[in-house]
């Protein structure tokens, strides 16, 4: 008991000079733990007389409380200092210029799709959609495509089984609309389509927009005027347009639409293969067989249909020479179209 004051003084000095919370914990264990120096003094009380024991016990408890209070005070000081240092280190200098958030932009294919849809919705068309996984009937048979047609071959179409496939065009949306609606019908059908093809101008997945108009008294002149006006508005300048006779099973007569090359103005360049013309879409008057199979009287109603590749239009509008660039997710390329 003689060295109690010295032991307390030693403990208080050690606490005062502690630099972190871990050191404080070690001091607490050293002095106040189960085998701590102050705790061990309590075991010496048995050697004292009954008269001395209460007074000695009170002194030891006072000493322990003094050390514990010093520990608590020092711990609070250290934690406060640590918090202050952390706040100072993390302080934001509001006078510094901000780091601007990079803004995104619509993909060029999305921009092109929206541009096409906006034109046709302004002249009374509605947007129709359908499943990308189609059955053979809606993708081929209902469109007057016989079983021996090359489009049904495995090298052109992704088949799941003999009856289910990934649609090769958005024409099935037209069929489903004709089956569920009566004329007049005015729709455009945007969406993803799939074909077994991949090179600088083809992709196994690409976007297509097809259009359909069915009503009484519709002629090829209506089709011609619609397409010419669309191309003029889409490319924002008057362009020469020509219609070449062609063949599609679902239209009769059918035509391929060429427009004056937007790169060289029709003078001839590498893009148009020095012809001055670029093919942009196929079109024609809806075949009577297609109307009849969809429950529409071909004697009363006529209609026209057209289809165009969205990536093809985007390539021509933005001067891109490789279709695959649209799907490479290269931000350096995509940032040009913000």
Swiss-Prot record:
GO MF, any single term: phenylalanine-tRNA ligase activity
Subcellular location: Cytoplasm
Catalytic activity: tRNA(Phe) + L-phenylalanine + ATP = L-phenylalanyl-tRNA(Phe) + AMP + diphosphate + H(+)
Domain of life: Bacteria
EC number assigned by the record: 6.1.1.20
Cofactor: binding details: Binds 2 magnesium ions per tetramer.
Name of the protein in question: Phenylalanine--tRNA ligase alpha subunit
Organism: Azotobacter vinelandii (strain DJ / ATCC BAA-1303)
Organism classification: Bacteria, Pseudomonadati, Pseudomonadota, Gammaproteobacteria, Pseudomonadales
């Amino acid at each position: 008991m003689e060295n109690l004051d010295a032991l307390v003084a030693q403990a208080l000095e050690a606490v005062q000079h502690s630099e972190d919370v871990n050191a404080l914990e070690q001091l607490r264990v050293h002095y106040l733990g189960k085998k701590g120096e102050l705790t061990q003094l309590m075991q010496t009380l048995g050697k004292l007389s009954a008269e001395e024991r209460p007074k000695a016990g009170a002194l030891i408890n006072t000493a322990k409380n003094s050390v514990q209070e010093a520990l608590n005070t020092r711990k609070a000081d250290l934690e406060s200092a640590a918090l202050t240092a952390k706040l100072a280190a993390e302080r934001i200098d509001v006078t510094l210029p901000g780091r601007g958030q990079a803004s995104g932009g619509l993909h060029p294919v999305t921009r092109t799709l929206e541009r096409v849809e906006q034109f046709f919705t302004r002249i009374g068309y509605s947007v129709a959609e359908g499943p990308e996984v189609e059955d053979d009937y809606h993708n081929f048979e209902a469109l007057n495509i016989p079983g021996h047609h090359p489009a049904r071959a495995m090298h052109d179409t992704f088949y799941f089984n003999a009856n289910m496939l990934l649609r090769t065009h958005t024409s099935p949306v037209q069929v489903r609309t004709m089956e569920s609606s009566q004329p007049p019908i005015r729709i455009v059908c945007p969406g993803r389509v799939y074909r077994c093809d991949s090179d600088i101008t083809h992709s196994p997945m690409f976007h297509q927009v097809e259009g359909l108009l069915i009503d009484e008294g519709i002629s090829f002149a209506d089709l011609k005027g619609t397409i010419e006006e669309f191309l003029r508005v889409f490319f924002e300048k008057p362009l020469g347009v020509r219609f070449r006779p062609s063949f599609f099973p679902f239209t009769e007569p059918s035509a391929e639409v060429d427009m004056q090359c937007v790169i060289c103005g029709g003078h001839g360049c590498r893009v148009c293969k020095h012809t001055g013309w670029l093919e942009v879409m196929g079109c024609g008057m809806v075949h009577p067989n297609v109307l009849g199979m969809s429950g529409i009287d071909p004697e009363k109603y006529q209609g026209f249909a057209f289809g165009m590749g969205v990536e093809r239009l985007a390539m021509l509008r933005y001067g891109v020479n490789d279709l695959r660039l649209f799907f490479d997710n290269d931000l350096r390329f995509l940032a040009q179209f913000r």
